[in-house]
């Protein structure tokens, strides 16, 4: 194989790998996806069935936008309404998940 073609292949592989590594998650994204997304939705909008069953509003709802990060943290940590308290997460993980969720709108 000519040297130029081999160099182009190596370069394209290196660029592909580098771009895959650069797509990093925010600190709370993995936690949100694992622990919150099933109810609150991937984009912060719950499915119609989940919204009705659990009385969940989308992150874009004015009532949700009006909540502070501390209020959301407390709701996650202690539970609120039909949402049970989050267990097995540190305060930092809950705060990171809240920050990620608030950024979805």
Enumerate the predicted regions with their spans.
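Bacterial N-terminal signal peptides that target proteins for export
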Residues: 1-12
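Mature, folded catalytic cores of secreted/periplasmic enzymes
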Residues: 14, 39, 61-65, 95-98, ...
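Periplasmic/extracellular electron-transfer cofactor-ligation site
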Residues: 29-55, 78-84, 103-105
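Electron-transfer interface patches adjacent to heme c in soluble/periplasmic c-type cytochromes
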Residues: 57-70, 85-93
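C-terminal capping alpha-helices of c-type cytochrome domains
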Residues: 75-76, 87-105
